[in-house]
């Protein structure tokens, strides 16, 4: 039987990794030869979850057409966020919870996108719809994905469906969601030992906003000053990325997991759009974004609207 690769976006977060594992397992249970893979490094937060539930992380690939003809995308759909040679393979399915952009296929596909906080929430439904029992370890990873994407249920992207799914999965995984979740988020917020290049690419996504090419990277921290003390070095590596990729804006967002506020560091010729979008002044290229924790709901649509205005 021909193999199908299942993967999330580049610079994968916990949902991208864990949903690839969970969905590949469901597809295998349903008779498909599916393998989860990843398009980037595993973050400290994700590694904490993998270690806790004793699951091996997916192998890394840069290209997919050299291995398979067919792939399944989870937690993304935009071409620039996917495998480098995504145009050379057939996308069979997409399971996602983001905006749909820069995506088209030559054949009809199974496309499931729901306005929930996490791909794993959708997968929880799909396991039940197909009558497949979720293994304890996989339930733990799916729970981890929801906790990560919802910032332990505090993000505005978090829905009642996400909370309900998390409670179900926590029971299967036999963990206390709140206690486990806080430990996992703290592990993800430990940025010690990271280079500046790693910091700006840990969770970075590229977007087309009107005619502008924008990259938004986000890291969680217990104290934003722990990251911003390196601002001069960060600006240097971000400026290099802006030049290399021809970006109009690179927005580096540092989110405080305790206060649920963020600080944005804006570099590029369109940095002023951040001021317009949030009605805040940039001082020394930074601005405090009160109550902003979600790239998907509070940054991407706000900036997109500002660029298109």
UniProtKB/Swiss-Prot annotation:
It is an enzyme of class 3 (hydrolase). Its cofactor is Mn(2+). The gene is ppaC. It catalyses: diphosphate + H2O = 2 phosphate + H(+). This is Probable manganese-dependent inorganic pyrophosphatase. Mn(2+) 1 binds at residues 9, 13, 75. Belongs to the PPase class C family. Gene3D superfamilies: DHHA2 domain (3.10.310.20), inorganic pyrophosphatase (n-terminal core) (3.90.1640.10). Binds 2 manganese ions per subunit.
């Amino acid at each position: 039987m021909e193999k199908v690769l299942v993967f999330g976006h580049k610079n994968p977060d916990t949902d991208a990794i864990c949903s690839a594992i969970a969905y590949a397992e469901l597809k295998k249970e349903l008779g498909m030869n599916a393998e989860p893979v990843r398009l980037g490094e595993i973050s400290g937060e994700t590694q904490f979850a993998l270690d806790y539930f004793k699951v091996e992380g997916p192998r890394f690939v840069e290209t997919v057409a050299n291995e398979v003809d067919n792939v399944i995308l989870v937690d993304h759909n935009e071409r620039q966020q996917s495998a480098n040679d995504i145009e050379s393979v057939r996308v069979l399915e997409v399971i996602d919870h983001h905006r749909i952009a820069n995506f088209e296929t030559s054949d009809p596909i199974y496309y499931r996108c729901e306005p929930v906080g996490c791909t794993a929430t959708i997968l929880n439904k799909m396991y039940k719809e197909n009558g497949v029992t979720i293994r304890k370890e996989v339930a733990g990873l799916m729970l981890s994905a929801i906790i990560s994407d919802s910032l332990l249920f505090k993000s505005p992207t978090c829905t009642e469906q996400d909370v309900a799914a998390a409670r179900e999965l926590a029971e299967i995984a036999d963990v206390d969601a709140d206690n486990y979740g806080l430990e996992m988020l703290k592990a993800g917020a430990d940025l010690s030992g990271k280079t500046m290049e790693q910091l700006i690419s840990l969770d970075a996504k590229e977007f087309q906003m009107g005619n502008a090419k924008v990259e938004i990277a986000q890291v969680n921290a217990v104290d934003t000053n722990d990251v911003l003390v390196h601002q001069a070095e960060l600006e240097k590596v971000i400026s290099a990325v802006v030049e290399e990729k021809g970006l109009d804006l690179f927005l580096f967002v540092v989110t405080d997991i305790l206060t649920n506020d963020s600080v944005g560091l804006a570099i590029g010729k369109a940095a002023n759009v951040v001021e317009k979008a949030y009605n805040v002044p940039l001082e020394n290229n930074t601005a405090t974004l009160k109550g902003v924790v979600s790239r998907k709901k509070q940054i991407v649509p706000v900036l997109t609207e500002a660029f298109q205005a």
